[in-house]
């Protein structure tokens, strides 16, 4: 399939020179040499056969999950127990188990960061796979983290029983002790709560309730609480937009509570009304990589960018403007052009703000209001990120003054993401409700184990007009309880979790009967009327951009806010943009890298090593932080992903990466930093060099006008091969006898590159479906990652053959410049998996006939025949073996 973009010129899109990454530039000769070799040269036999770290272990090196404490033993026992009472299968009406036949149950996930309505695939009473609930009225899609969440159920690092002063105890004793610590000076601290049943239990408990999020949207929520009287964020309807301008809002990645990838893909179908996408951002995000136009702006410039766009629109409609600092000359014209396009698009325009700033949000919301945007909906709010930084700051002050003596934390690892709270932990008695003894629960006097969402009754009201339920698909693997039952018990209640959820469904006036609600997983409820008004722009004060080096934090596709910090699938998933797995690292522009003496180099065995730096912010220093030189990164701005640097996550997550929140609290968007290169070298787990395209034409892409007006045969010619008979097609240039497919199906699959955003959800889903093993960082560095599906990312360069002819550039100089990246390169994603070739090269070279061709055109593998020669991998032109 072709990739269609709305703005690139025909010459640029048809003949872009793409390069795999910065490694191609640092050592092109070595990179080209590695491209010709499937295997790295310097992997010794000893390295291949063993691992020193596991030499004394009886556990197989390949059995990574078992070594890290993930086991299905508990699941086997739990599945042998009686079926969950009142669970309703989604598809198979009789609740009976047939060996080998899967049952599907509708459920919902909310962990304080992600919300999704899902279908849970179970076999023999065990959850094994998460599927999207396409019938859901709100966020029925899944991302990589939601897909990976099923593995967390089997994590042996979860709490197995209540803990009191570090020792296991009974629920009765733990609850009694916890209740004794609760006084009128106690506070319940949670992440955002969207469960009506849990809210009722919290109200019954009677404690002061403070909610704070690890990735804060508090200042944005403040704007709409003041405007509508309800705390939440506006919902987005991309189907109604024709032009979206996102400023720091990675809406295809982690921004917002909705998963907008499906809506984006639908809106990007080539046609006269195809959605145009413009992105302004500091670091290259998933949204920026998919944008038609990308403007590089520092995070501290976001407010200025939004202010200039607002002023242009305000002038056009005749309302007052706001005072704003001048824009940099290199982006001024681009921003003005965006404003003109927004005005022309009118109600089809959509402006999104990703900065946790009331000023930025007001500017974006008011611009949408002036344009009468149909895609920006403030009457239907999203409640999944409504924590309050103001309330949390007040709590910290009360702890300092001694006004708060005990804190109950519920499903929030606040001592990890808040350095301020961590410094005050000794001043209060802690009671923690959590799934594991994390950094917060390990410091608690009482720790109460909370069940995984796949073994608990839950409900959720994630947005206006939506009510969802979650049902257990397996009995609890350990001695844990659902959050709503724990809080209700602390409040003196005795109801079971299912009774509490049933009562909540009734009080929410769900539109479906109980059994139908469980079957579907969701129901409509009446949308609460919100106050309508207009934003007051008189108090808007636009901040001046920082002059020094800017430091900001961001989230990665696999890790998110860090809720899955002991889940190996989230670590092993390569970042869609950097193509690195397992670590977090500072992303830095090439210009800044030169200034600070930072470099990333490809090693002779194909691995990547780079410089580390010490980052200092307000006297606090993070030492030996690895740096990745990222094309498209704005000069003068560096970013570091949150969720890493754990010490009490479990065997997988402990000591992986650094904790970015030690330098920057979630409530703060950015700050000025100083950087000094250190002498420590860091080894990256890079997968991009491990899979090359052997110098062949990689991407077919065309601009929209040519796509709509031209004949496809003119720009998408079928490849031919030269022969003594003249050019031959692939079918004509056939050295083998044709396969016999007359008596059966002939399967085919194609991927629409215009729809693929590179999010990586399919990579994790493939690993789940096929039981693909996790191998760990060391093995990834040795190019032994086991993903059956990968999503290659390629950058483009501005130099093309046509440009060279126009400028009179010679051949040698032309090819040299083709290897030089643009400062803001275009990005394309290409999923690659087994192509099930008609005459698969892997089949012809296998010495034991382990790879065979089916009569339905599929490439089959007999694992018990394979002897591990890897001739198939050597002979695979797509490098997916």
Regions found by a protein language model. Name each.
Residues 2-329, 336, 580-584, 591-595, ...:
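N-terminal export/assembly segments and adjacent metallocofactor-ligating motifs
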Residues 55, 319, 476-529, 778:
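N-terminal leader/propeptide and maturation segments of large enzyme subunits in energy/redox metabolism
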Residues 289-295, 449-451, 466-476:
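Short beta-alpha connecting loops at secondary-structure transitions
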Residues 436-470, 786:
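Flexible glycine/proline-rich, aromatic-decorated loop/lid segments
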Residues 244-245, 277, 294, 407, ...:
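Short, well-ordered beta-strand core segments
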């Amino acid at each position: 399939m072709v990739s269609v973009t709305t703005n690139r010129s025909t010459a640029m899109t048809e003949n872009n020179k793409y390069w795999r990454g910065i490694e191609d530039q640092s050592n092109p000769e070595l990179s080209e040499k590695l491209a010709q070799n499937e295997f790295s040269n310097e992997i010794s036999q000893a390295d291949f056969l063993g691992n020193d770290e596991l030499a004394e272990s009886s556990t197989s090196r390949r059995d990574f999950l078992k070594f890290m404490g993930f086991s299905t033993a508990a699941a086997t026992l739990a599945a042998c127990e009686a079926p969950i009472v009142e669970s309703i299968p989604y598809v198979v009406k009789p609740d009976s188990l047939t060996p080998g036949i899967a049952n599907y149950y509708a459920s919902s996930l909310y962990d304080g960061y992600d919300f999704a309505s899902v279908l849970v695939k179970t076999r023999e009473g065990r959850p094994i796979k998460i599927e999207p609930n396409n019938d859901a009225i709100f966020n029925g899609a899944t991302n990589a983290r939601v897909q990976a969440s099923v593995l967390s159920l089997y994590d042996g690092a979860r709490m197995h029983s209540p803990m009191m002063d570090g020792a296991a105890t009974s629920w009765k004793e733990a609850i009694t002790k916890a209740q004794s610590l609760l006084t009128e000076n106690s506070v319940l601290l949670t992440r955002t709560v969207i469960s009506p049943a849990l809210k009722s239990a919290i109200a019954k408990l009677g404690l002061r309730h403070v909610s704070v999020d690890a990735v804060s949207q508090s200042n944005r929520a403040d704007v709409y609480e003041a405007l509508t009287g309800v705390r939440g964020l506006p919902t987005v309807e991309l189907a109604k937009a024709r032009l979206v301008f996102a400023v720091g809002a990675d809406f295809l990645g982690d921004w917002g509570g909705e998963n907008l990838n499906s809506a984006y893909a639908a809106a990007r179908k080539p046609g006269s009304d195809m959605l145009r996408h413009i992105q302004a951002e500091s670091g290259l995000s998933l949204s920026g990589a998919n944008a038609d136009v990308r403007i590089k702006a520092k995070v501290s410039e976001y407010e200025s960018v939004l202010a200039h766009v607002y002023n242009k629109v305000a002038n056009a409609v005749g309302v007052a403007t706001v005072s704003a600092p001048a824009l940099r000359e290199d982006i001024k014209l681009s921003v003005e052009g965006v404003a003109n396009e927004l005005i022309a698009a009118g109600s089809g325009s959509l402006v999104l703000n990703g900065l946790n700033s009331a000023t930025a949000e007001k500017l974006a919301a008011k611009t949408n209001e002036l344009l009468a945007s149909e895609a920006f909906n403030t009457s239907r709010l999203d409640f999944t990120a409504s924590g309050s930084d103001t309330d949390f700051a007040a709590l910290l002050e009360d702890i300092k003054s001694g006004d708060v003596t005990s804190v109950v934390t519920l499903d929030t690892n606040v001592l990890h993401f808040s350095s301020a709270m961590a410094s005050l932990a000794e001043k209060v008695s802690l009671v923690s409700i959590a799934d594991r003894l994390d950094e917060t629960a390990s410091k608690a006097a009482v720790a109460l184990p909370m069940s995984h969402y796949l073994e608990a009754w839950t409900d959720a009201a994630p947005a206006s007009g939506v009510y969802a339920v979650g049902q257990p698909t397996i009995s609890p693997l350990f001695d844990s309880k659902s959050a709503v039952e724990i809080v209700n018990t602390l409040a003196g209640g005795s109801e079971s979790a299912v009774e509490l959820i049933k009562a909540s469904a009734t009080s929410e006036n769900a539109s479906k009967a109980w059994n139908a609600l469980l079957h579907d997983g969701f129901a409509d409820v009446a949308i609460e009327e919100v106050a309508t008004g207009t934003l007051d722009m008189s108090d808007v004060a636009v901040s001046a951009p920082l002059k020094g080096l800017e430091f900001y934090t961001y989230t990665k596709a696999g890790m998110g806010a860090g809720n899955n910090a002991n889940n190996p699938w989230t670590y092993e998933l390569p970042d869609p943009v950097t193509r690195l797995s397992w670590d977090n690292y500072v992303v830095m522009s090439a210009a800044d890298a030169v200034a600070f003496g930072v470099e990333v180099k490809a090693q002779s065995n194909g691995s990547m090593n780079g410089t580390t730096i010490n980052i200092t912010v307000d006297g606090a220093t993070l030492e030996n932080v690895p740096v990745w030189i990222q094309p498209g990164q704005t000069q003068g701005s560096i970013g570091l992903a949150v969720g890493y640097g754990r010490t009490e996550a479990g065997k997988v997550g402990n000591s992986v990466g650094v904790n970015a929140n030690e330098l920057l609290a979630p409530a703060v968007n950015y700050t000025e930093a100083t950087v000094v290169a250190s002498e420590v070298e860091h080894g990256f787990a890079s997968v991009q060099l491990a899979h090359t395209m052997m110098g062949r034409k990689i991407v077919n892409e065309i601009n929209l006008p040519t796509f709509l007006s031209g004949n496809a045969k003119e720009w998408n010619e079928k490849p031919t091969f030269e022969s003594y008979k003249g050019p031959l097609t692939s079918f004509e240039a056939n050295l083998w006898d044709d396969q016999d497919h007359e008596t059966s199906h002939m399967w085919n699959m194609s991927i629409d590159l215009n729809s693929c955003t590179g999010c990586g959800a399919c990579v994790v889903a493939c690993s789940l479906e096929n039981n693909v093993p996790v191998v760990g960082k060391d093995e990834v560095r040795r190019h032994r990652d086991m993903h059956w599906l990968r999503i290659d990312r390629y950058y483009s360069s501005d130099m093309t053959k046509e440009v060279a002819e126009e400028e009179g550039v010679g051949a040698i100089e032309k090819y040299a410049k083709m290897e030089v990246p643009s400062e803001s390169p275009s990005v394309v994603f290409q999923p690659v998996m087994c192509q099930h070739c008609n005459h698969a090269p892997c089949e012809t070279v296998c010495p034991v006939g382990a790879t065979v061709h089916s009569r339905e055109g599929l490439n089959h593998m007999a694992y018990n025949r394979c002897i591990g020669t890897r001739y198939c991998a050597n002979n695979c032109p797509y490098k997916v073996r």
